[in-house]
C-alpha cells in the first residue's frame, strides 16, 4: 500500500483504467508548461527541496567560527479532491462505455491550471517566482487585433536574439488568443500560418496563462522538478460516491532570465 491508499477504494481495475485514461488525456490537453520547460523527475515522494548551490552567512555559534546556510527551493504538494459516483464505477463492470467521468476531467483541468499558473505567473507562498516575473526582457503588448500578432512576435524573437538566446522558439497563447489566430486571416492567409513562418518551434494552447509567452526551448533555461508525478489517491467512500484526489509534488526554477519575452 502506498500513501495514495488506492487499495481501499471500492473501484475495479477496469474502472481505475478508465479514470486514469480520462485523467491523463484531460491533464495533457490543458497543461502547457511541461511542453516547453525541462522536466526533472519524478524523483520520489521523499523529495523535499532542490539545492540551489548558493549559501548565505548566518550568525556564528562562537567567536572564530564562520557559519553559512545552504539555500534550497522547497518542493510543494498540490492536491485537488473530487468525487465520482459509485454507479459510474459499477457501470463499467456491467459493460458501460459511457460512464460519467466529468468530475475527473474537471479536477484534472484544475490541477493542470494550478501547475501552469505556478510556472508562468509564480507562487510566492511556495517561493516560486515564475516565468513572467523572472524574465529580464521588456514585456511587449499583445495586440488587440490578431492580424498584428506576427509583427509583435517578430519583435519578441528579435529581443531574444539580441539577448544572445538561441532557438527554437515556442509561442504559448491563452485560450482567446489561440482561438483568434485560428479564426483570423490576413488577405486570405490564416494568421496561424503567418506565425508558423516566423517561428521555428510550436504554437501551444495554454489556457491557464494570461496573454502570451515566447520562450526558447533550447534547454537548460528553466526546470520543473517533480517529486511525485500526477497521481490519483483515495480519501473515502459511502453508499453513493467515492472521494478521490489528484496529487503531485513540484517546484519550478528559472536560470536564464533572458530566455523569455512575455506579452500582455
UniProtKB/Swiss-Prot annotation:
It is found in: Encapsulin nanocompartment. Keywords: Encapsulin nanocompartment. Its main location: other. It holds the Pfam family Linocin_M18. Stable as a monodisperse organelle up to 50 degrees Celsius, at higher temperatures they aggregate. One of its GO terms (cellular component) is encapsulin nanocompartment. Transmembrane segments: none annotated. The keyword Ion transport does not apply. Gene3D superfamilies: 3.30.2400.30, hypothetical protein PF0899 domain. Foreign proteins can be targeted to ectopic nanocompartments in E.coli upon coexpression with a construct using the 38 C-terminal residues of DypB (AC C0ZVK5), tested with GFP and luciferase. Probably only one molecule of each foreign protein is inside the nanocompartment due to its small interior space. Belongs to the encapsulin family. Family 1 subfamily. NCBIfam families: encap_f1 (NF041155). Shell component of a type 1 encapsulin nanocompartment. Assembles into proteinaceous shells 21-24 nm in diameter. Empty organelles can be expressed in E.coli. Cargo proteins (DypB) are targeted to the interior via their C-terminal extensions. Forms hollow shells composed of 60 subunits. Monomers probably form pentamers which assemble into the shell. There are 12 pores where the pentamers meet as well as 3-fold axis channels and dimer channels; none are larger than 3-4 Angstroms in diameter. The N-terminus of the protein is inside the shell, the C-terminus is outside. PANTHER family: PEPTIDASE U56 FAMILY, TYPE 1 ENCAPSULIN SHELL PROTEIN. This is Type 1 encapsulin shell protein. It comes from Rhodococcus erythropolis (strain PR4 / NBRC 100887).
Amino acid at each position: 500500500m502506498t500513501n495514495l491508499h488506492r487499495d481501499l477504494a471500492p473501484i475495479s481495475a477496469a474502472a481505475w483504467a478508465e479514470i486514469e485514461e480520462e485523467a491523463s488525456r484531460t491533464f495533457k490537453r490543458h497543461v502547457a508548461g511541461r511542453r516547453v520547460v525541462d522536466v526533472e523527475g519524478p524523483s520520489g515522494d521523499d523529495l523535499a527541496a532542490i539545492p540551489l548551490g548558493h549559501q548565505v552567512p548566518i550568525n556564528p555559534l562562537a567567536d572564530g567560527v564562520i557559519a553559512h546556510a545552504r539555500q534550497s527551493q522547497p518542493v510543494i504538494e498540490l492536491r485537488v479532491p473530487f468525487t465520482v459516483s459509485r454507479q459510474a464505477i459499477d457501470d463499467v463492470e456491467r459493460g458501460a462505455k459511457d460512464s460519467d467521468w466529468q468530475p475527473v476531467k474537471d479536477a484534472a483541468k484544475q490541477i493542470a491550471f494550478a501547475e501552469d499558473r505556478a510556472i508562468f505567473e509564480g507562487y510566492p507562498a511556495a517561493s516560486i517566482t515564475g516565468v513572467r516575473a523572472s524574465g529580464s526582457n521588456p514585456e511587449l503588448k499583445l495586440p488587440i487585433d490578431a492580424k498584428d500578432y506576427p509583427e509583435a512576435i517578430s519583435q519578441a524573437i528579435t529581443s531574444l536574439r539580441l539577448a544572445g538566446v538561441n532557438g527554437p522558439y515556442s509561442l504559448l497563447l491563452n485560450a482567446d488568443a489561440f482561438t483568434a489566430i485560428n479564426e483570423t486571416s490576413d488577405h486570405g492567409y490564416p494568421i496561424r500560418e503567418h506565425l508558423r513562418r516566423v517561428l521555428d518551434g510550436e504554437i501551444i494552447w495554454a489556457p491557464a496563462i494570461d496573454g502570451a509567452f515566447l520562450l526558447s526551448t533550447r534547454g537548460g533555461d528553466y526546470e520543473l522538478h517533480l517529486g511525485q508525478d500526477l497521481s490519483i489517491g483515495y480519501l473515502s467512500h459511502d453508499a453513493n460516491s467515492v472521494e478521490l484526489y489528484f496529487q503531485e509534488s513540484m517546484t519550478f526554477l528559472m536560470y536564464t532570465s533572458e530566455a523569455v519575452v512575455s506579452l500582455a
